[in-house]
Amino acid sequence: MADRTDMLDGGALAARTLREAGVEVVFALHGGHLDTFLTGCRRYGIRLVDCRHEAAAVNAADGYARSTGRLGVAAVTSGPGLFNSIGGISAAAADGVGVLVITSSPPLGEAETRELQGGLDQIAAVRPITKWAHRVTSTSRIPDLVGLAVRHAQGGQPGPVVLDIPIDVGFTSVDPSKLAAAGKPEIAPRPVPPARSIASLAELIDASERPVVVVGDGSLAMDFRSELDDFAEATGIPVFRSGLSRGGLTHGHKLNAGGIFSLMALPALGAGTPDLVILVGASHGLFLGGRRFYPMCAGAKMAQIHLDAAEILSLIHISEPTRPY
């Protein structure tokens, strides 16, 4: 039996696992259900940023993820706290942003007793707008399930996840040597695309006279900023950004050609239209110029690289579809 001083409560276990995952900051709005988690964040050196509304906390985590390419984490309290955050969770879901929302709920043993901030199935409510949502029922499973939440949020096409740690589970202390087996709270390196796809794309580039690259909102999750710089400089191909992109070439780079509407303006400027468009992490729709984008590229071959296989070939024929894993 561990000495009481060696025991860790559920909130500390959650914070420790997030720190192991590289999390440095959590955006939060305090609620008593979260006390052990917030105390655990201080214990393990995770900076807490206090927010005035739960949706703002999730929006801040979303913005952090978009601007850094790292996991954004928000903490909101039980019941109305989580329901106040649904607008932020929905935005992260729509744009494929990796955000982990830590929440809580009334004690498991008080279900159906008109408990404080209870009475509604939180997980059922957020499941349609998340990649994954789960309620922890055992303190010893917290490291395992926090790690799983991290992998769900960042693996494949990123998106929001919700992990509910009920107040009694979060406040219970356990012997750290007796925890359930847990995987690492990180995603494995992505495999490279098939050699055949790379060779086909290289052939398209060699055969083109006016190729362009369009980088989209998925570029941060794909984490290739330095490679994109190297590619542009080696090929001389200009790089444009879709309306949602926070990636692309570094600011001031000579081949940073601006936003998608700069590309669409080329014919009016007498510059002609591209004969090859390479979409990198760019999703079809309004922020790629909507349906006006496709007539402008009617004579061009299209290549697309995207984490989400369902996004490839949507709305338009792609000459070379490439999934980077």
Predicted segments, located by residue:
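Single conserved hydrophobic/aromatic residue that forms the stacking wall/gate
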Residues: 316-320, 324-325
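Structural signature of the thiamine diphosphate
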Residues: 24-25, 66-103, 127-180, 201-204, ...
